[in-house]
Amino acid sequence: MAKYNVPADVPDELIDTFIDNMNAATAGTGRMNLFACDQKIEHLNDDFYDGGKKIPLSSNDPGHLFEIGNQCHQQGTIGVLAGQLGLIAQYARDYPEIPYLVKLNSKSHLVKTKQRDPVSQALWDMDDVMSLVHNGINVVGIGYTIYIGSEYEHEMMSEAAQLIRQAHELGMISVVWMYPRGAAVGNEKDPQLISGAAGVAACIGADFAKVNYPAEFEGMSLSLIHISE
């Protein structure tokens, strides 16, 4: 098993719980392969239905995500399934072995940046998350999206920071989706900007940062270029 850095806001009596959640989320490697299932809000139906042309009709059933997640978890190819609390609540009892990461905020893609800088506020709080835990759902942590560079970034950072602290106090892990976006952002894939966004995630206490793959940059290794292709 990997050795983890346990944040100081995790109570002493919950350190083992935090480590157990880390092991569950990373299969003991310290590296997370997250199965993101938050697109039902984020992308609406764009990724799930096209009349059967390229997307299988089975993909339009929300339960299909959990079938995939369960199979991949059994194979050891994913650590956690990340989704909104409501979606997890609907299906988790049928798939009790999957470790879940509850995504606390979300927004659709309908309002574009040219109309308004993005903002995504929490739809649930930690009491709601704990209600799932008390009902026997295998929740190991929380997730939150921050649009760094938005004029509303301070609102999202403040909310995320408090939720991360509360999650740690309960022995849970946290993942922050860090996406540069807004009128002030010239290039969302700029490597320096993405690196800075990851640093912001560290500063608000996140255990993991989910970022966009950066544009090619000087010194990029061939292995990374091959992955991007």
Regions found by a protein language model. Name each.
Residues 55-158, 173:
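Active-site beta->alpha loop and helix N-cap motifs at the rims of alpha/beta catalytic domains
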